[in-house]
Each structure stands twice: as structure tokens, then as C-alpha cells.
A protein has these predicted regions:
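Phosphate/Mg2+-binding loops and adjacent switch elements
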Residues: 78-192
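C-terminal accessory "lid"/substrate-recognition subdomains
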Residues: 154-251
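Walker A (P-loop) phosphate-binding motif
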Residues: 26-88
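N-terminal pre-Walker A segment at the start of P-loop NTPase domains
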Residues: 15-24
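Conserved small/polar residues in nucleotide/adenosyl-binding loops
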Residues: 1-5
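Active-site regions of enzymes building and remodeling cell-envelope glycoconjugates
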Residues: 36, 85-89, 106-108, 143-146, ...
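Short, well-ordered alpha-helices that flank and scaffold nucleotide-derived cofactor binding pockets
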Residues: 56, 60, 64, 104, ...
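Conserved beta-strand elements of the Class I
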Residues: 70-72, 147, 217-220
């Protein structure tokens, strides 16, 4: 048994407590219909899985049909506790780097309380709200739910927090999404398609970096899964001379 497995085993009692707490939260929570269509882009694991870039692309696509799309984000590491409409010139320490990125692409609201945030979006004329994260939240009614899965990582060790990365059990998640969008797998042959998961789709965006092929680079990143970034550079035959990995949303 490796150290990581040992730690997961020791933390497993806390995962049981987490599971009970989540079920109590689900039982007593009541989703509110705010009167505006809501699409949620979420995941099952703590950390990055590609939700933000998917949300950005989804906004671009749906902007042909909806004139006033708001992205609603929790603003991970943002200091402000009250809902706020974010601009590209907002202080990232107050609203988070994630919210700034969304604001550079369109109307954005940062809110720790999703119900209050959704109401602020509606007050400002939103005719569609895209939630970046919040699949497990029961604050507001979601009209359509997209589960994003990184095929390289999947669901980690399949344990709930804190013994593993899962925010909810895999079985309970099967009834908590409309489509599963698998990223970082261009072959369409993920093992997830054989595990009775419904409505599985694949997403891949190819980026040409021919100019960097065989070039020496210093690689650094501050995302949820830095290993994916480094592996992609290696696949592109880029010579990595030095690597510096920062925590997710590093300032």
C-alpha cells in the first residue's frame, strides 16, 4: 500500500461524515426557480476539470440565440462575500482570476450565494445564466446540467472527500446531469462509455504549436491538474528544460 492509499484509508471515516452531511443538505434544500433559464457546467471532483473553458465556449455558441448571457461563478479565492457584476477591470483579489477571465468574454456575476447571484443576473436583464460549477448546489433550479470529466483523471480513486476527490458519489451523480462531456480524449473510446453513464459526448480542441516543436521552454502553470499541461507539451515534442507548478488559481 502506497502512502497516498494509506492516507485515503485513514481519511475514509471523514468521508462517511461528508456523505451524511451532503445527504442532509440535499434533503433540506429546495431549489428555487428564478424565472431565467439556467445551464450548469459542473464536475464531480474537487479541483480543475475544464469547466471554465467549456463555459466560455458554450457562451460563444449560445450568444447567437441569447442576447444577454450571464456567467455565474463562485469566484474561487475571491474575497468579496456579496454578489457583484464583474468587469474585466475588477480587482482579481476581490473577485478571483476565474471571474476576470469570464468578464473578458462577456457579462459575469461573482457570488458565493448562487441564489442571490442569479437574482442579480436577472435584475440586470439576463435571459440565460451559465453556471461555472455548482452541480452539487441545490440553491437554484437548473434547466440543463453538463457534467465535465477529464478522461486522464476520471474520478480519481472514486472516494468521497476528503479521502478522495469526489464531491458526491458516482451513483448519485448519474441522475444529476443531462450530458457527460469528456475532455482530453479524442478517440471516443473512454472506459466511461461502458460503465452505464448516459449521454456521453467527447470534446477536443486542437491547437497547433508547430513553432515550439523541439524548442527549449520553461513551463509553468497554475491550474487544477498541472500534470495534464506538462504531458501535452511532451506529446507536442517540446523540450521542457524547467517546470514550475503552482497551486490552482495561484496569484
Amino acid at each position: 500500500m502506497c502512502i497516498r492509499d494509506s492516507i485515503s484509508f485513514l481519511l475514509s471515516p471523514l468521508s462517511i461524515i461528508y456523505f451524511i452531511g451532503f445527504k442532509v443538505y440535499e434533503f433540506f434544500s429546495k431549489e428555487v426557480d428564478i424565472g431565467v433559464p439556467v445551464i450548469c457546467v459542473g464536475n464531480l471532483v474537487a479541483g480543475g476539470s475544464g469547466k471554465t473553458p467549456i463555459t466560455i465556449e458554450l457562451r460563444k455558441y449560445l450568444s447567437k440565440k441569447y442576447s444577454k448571457i450571464f456567467v455565474l461563478t463562485r469566484g474561487y479565492k475571491g474575497k468579496l462575500k456579496v454578489p457583484i457584476i464583474v468587469s474585466k477591470n475588477s480587482n482579481y483579489l476581490n473577485v478571483s482570476d476565474e471571474a476576470i477571465i469570464h468578464a473578458q468574454n462577456g457579462l459575469t456575476c461573482m457570488a458565493k450565494n448562487k441564489k442571490l447571484g442569479a437574482e442579480l443576473c436577472k435584475k440586470n436583464g439576463a435571459n440565460l445564466i451559465l453556471m461555472d460549477d455548482g452541480l452539487q448546489s441545490k440553491d437554484i433550479k437548473k434547466n440543463f446540467k453538463i457534467l465535465v470529466v477529464d478522461d486522464n483523471y476520471k474520478f480519481g480513486n472514486n472516494f468521497l472527500l476528503p479521502a478522495g476527490p469526489l464531491r458526491q458519489t458516482i451513483n448519485s451523480a448519474k441522475s444529476n446531469y443531462d450530458i457527460m462531456l469528456i475532455i482530453r480524449n479524442g478517440n471516443g473510446d473512454s472506459t466511461l462509455t461502458t460503465e452505464k453513464h448516459k449521454n456521453v459526448f467527447y470534446a477536443e480542441k486542437k491547437i497547433k504549436l508547430k513553432k515550439l516543436k523541439y524548442k527549449d521552454v520553461f513551463a509553468f502553470s497554475g491550474i487544477g491538474n498541472n500534470e495534464n499541461f506538462v504531458n501535452k507539451l511532451k506529446e507536442l515534442k517540446i523540450n521542457i528544460k524547467m517546470i514550475k507548478n503552482f497551486p490552482d488559481h495561484h496569484n
